[in-house]
């Protein structure tokens, strides 16, 4: 194990716990200066940067549960490090990777602050578009449109979770207990 791995993870989680408004406000001035505000790639980069500490923290707990003996025995059987990782470690890690990927996807999919601040109206994602159905103080909203949009936005997530249900359950239980 690395000497300062715990403190690096904690520093990353502290940044993850900060309000997104605080993190995104630092990006706005360079994005305007470089003329990359309002497009999807910059928003994707910011969402990856914000969700990366959570992803590393989850994967770290899964990696701690893999016995070191598996890696060593694969190398005794003639595998090099890459083959041992590919054929032994990845199949064991697959439920954890799927679970972490789905959690990260859900965090980015449901993000309102980052997408509403960094994207222009023509590149708007689903969550700010749904919020626009609710109206403002000056005009009445279309609440039934918002409800229909929420159901439409939730349906793909439901099917995605149902498709990966077995990996999610085994991934959640695998990273829960160290032993």
Question: What are the language-model segments listed below?
Answer:
Residues 1-179:
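A structural signal for multi-pass alpha-helical bundles of membrane permease subunits
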